A protein has these predicted regions:
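A short, conserved alpha-helix within the catalytic core of class I
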Residues: 74-82
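Helix-to-beta-strand junctions that scaffold the AdoMet/dcAdoMet cofactor pocket
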Residues: 16, 86-89
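Conserved beta-strand signature within the Rossmann-like core of class I S-adenosyl-L-methionine
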Residues: 90-98, 102
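Short beta-strand element of Class I
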Residues: 18-22, 93
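Active-site capping/gating segments
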Residues: 102-139
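S-adenosyl-L-methionine
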Residues: 24-64, 68
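Conserved SAM-binding loop of SAM-dependent methyltransferases across substrates and taxa
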Residues: 5-18
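Conserved S-adenosyl-L-methionine
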Residues: 2
């Protein structure tokens, strides 16, 4: 969700060619970026959906077993609630937190939806721009 240039979707498709990758981006120009980049890197078959994820009908899509939230536009908790409604029972949500505020919002969304937060992974090449990779499941 929030595919931007498509880098995470493309890498997922390259690493797991059998994977059905469905990506969402609010900005309409994201579709062209995704198409260009998926061709450039040899990762065909990614379904790119543009528009506001919170208002997107998800019924045409298979239940996801993994969801990566890359962009949330300040609506992270609402996104988590919507994802929980369609997430496969054994599925997970992954989020890269780059600020204390986004970490807190993810934790609140997970707690409010009765999900389980797993231990996170911290990545930092230096003291600038640390990333916390967070994961949650239904149980």
């Amino acid at each position: 969700i929030g595919f931007c240039t498509g880098s995470v979707s493309i890498e997922a498709r390259l690493q797991f060619p059998h994977l059905a990758v469905i990506s969402f981006e609010i900005r309409p120009e994201g579709k062209e970026l995704m198409d260009t980049n998926s061709r450039r890197f040899g990762a065909p078959g990614i379904t790119a959906v543009t528009g506001d994820f919170l208002y997107t009908d998800l019924t045409p899509f298979a239940r996801p077993d993994a969801v990566f939230i890359g962009g949330h536009g300040g609506h992270l908790e609402e996104m988590i609630e919507k994802v929980k409604q369609v997430l496969h029972p054994e599925g997970c949500i992954v989020f890269n937190s780059v600020s204390a505020e986004s970490k807190e919002a993810f934790c609140r969304g997970i707690e409010r939806n009765g999900m389980v937060l797993h231990p996170s992974t911290h990545i930092a090449l230096n003291e600038y721009n640390p990333i916390e990779i967070m994961k949650a499941t239904l149980s």
